[in-house]
A protein has these predicted regions:
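Non-transmembrane functional regions of envelope-associated proteins
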Residues: 2-223, 255-332
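Substrate-access "cap/lid" subdomains that shape
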Residues: 209-251
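Hydrophobic transmembrane alpha-helices
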Residues: 320-354
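A general marker of short, structured functional hotspots
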Residues: 135-142, 232-235, 341
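Active-site proximal loops enriched in glycine and acidic residues that flank catalytic Cys/His/Asp
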Residues: 239, 263-264, 354
Length: 354
């Protein structure tokens, strides 16, 4: 009888541990998700492409930074190759030292080009604000807030049809698995660069956000499906999507109808981010978030999963206890890894199929 009482206490402790959900259990879940991501079969995207400014491009076209007339000419080159939208994830926060801002402003005004801005710890706010319709509860306790936003210089900001936030949200271990679709500063909402790409692709002037009592629930561009997010407005990135990559200095293929991301991969200019599938360039995060939203199959963690994990932990602990107390300890030693492997492959099946 004493053994059963002790076993009951052990079961309660294990269930209580799962209910408390300490950080190391969260890390176990994240590492399991990482493995599921790595096990996925890569898939190509037909409507996205990446054009690199790499070391060979710099050698052929000249050192960086280019004057903005040259940047404008390269954007025109991409549209001449058939691009429907060109994404330039670069911050133009200072006037061009060569005085060529007018050339870039003219191109931005005539084309559906998307450029970037960034959050800042300084309180100065030069960011471009986008219209948003909010529904439901107050979003301010949930959306990531920053003291300020650094945007393009006024001449470029006024000419650009789309300006989006370039921001990531690394987890506790420094690995990026999610991307904020919206951030806040000074009581205003700023969409991510991915949201701005979707907005300009749909021809809409604003975006929508729904917030519940437990945080942000969904974001939406009117002509696209609802985008499920976590409580902070983040989207889980699906890294199985791959885009064709070309070099800017080479002859470009037919890019008709494609969203083209102009990316910096030259040594010293590249931005590398740690992800579950290894170190990748920051423009790959933009592509992954776009693909996740456009396909309508973003990764979510339903509210009932915590209850399911708690119930599974309790049932598993109970079965192990009964086996050990009525048979022998080594039967439990065999059963435990079977439970662990089964739970991993069960979660892998749910991740892949649902």
């Amino acid at each position: 009888m004493k053994k059963w009482i002790i076993s009951l206490f052990v079961i309660l402790i294990l269930c209580g541990l799962r209910f408390a959900d300490p950080w190391f259990l969260d890390m176990v879940r994240l590492k399991a998700l990482d493995q599921h991501q790595r096990n996925q079969v890569s898939m190509n995207l037909s409507n996205l492409a990446t054009v690199e400014i790499n070391n060979q491009t710099i050698r052929k076209l000249g050192q960086w930074p280019w004057d903005r007339n040259r940047v404008a000419n390269q954007i025109i080159k991409l549209y001449q190759a058939g691009a429907s939208i060109v994404v330039v994830p670069i911050l133009f926060a200072d006037p061009d030292r060569f005085g060529k801002d007018d050339a870039l402003a003219r191109v931005l005004k005539k084309t559906p080009t998307v450029i970037g801005q960034i959050p800042s710890n300084d309180k100065s706010n030069t960011g471009v604000v986008r219209g948003v319709a909010t529904v439901g509860e107050d979003w301010q306790p949930w959306v990531y807030r920053y003291p300020g936003v650094v945007g393009p210089i006024p001449k470029i900001a006024e000419s650009a049809n789309a300006v989006g936030m370039m921001v990531i949200a690394p987890e506790k271990d420094g690995v990026t698995r999610r991307m904020p679709l919206v951030i806040a500063s000074d009581g205003k909402l700023f969409p991510s660069i991915s949201m701005e790409i979707l907005r300009i692709a749909a021809g809409d002037v604003s975006f929508q956000m729904k917030t519940g009592i437990a945080g942000v629930e969904k974001l939406r561009i009117p002509k696209y499906k609802m985008i499920d997010t976590d409580a902070n407005g983040n989207i889980w990135l699906d890294f199985k999507w791959k885009t064709p990559v070309y070099a800017l200095h080479e002859k470009l293929p037919d890019l008709t109808g494609k969203i083209v991301i102009l990316s910096m991969t030259a040594s010293g200019l590249e931005s590398v981010v740690s992800t579950p599938v290894g170190n990748i360039h920051s423009h790959d995060l933009i592509a992954a978030s776009l693909a996740t939203m456009m396909t309508g199959r973003n990764i979510t963690r339903p509210f009932w999963t915590d209850l399911a994990e708690l119930a599974a932990s309790g049932v598993g602990a109970l079965i192990l206890t009964i086996v050990v107390l009525t048979m022998a300890w080594y039967f439990g030693a065999v059963l435990l890894p079977i439970f662990l492997v089964g739970s991993f492959y069960g979660s892998s099946y749910l991740f892949t199929e649902y």
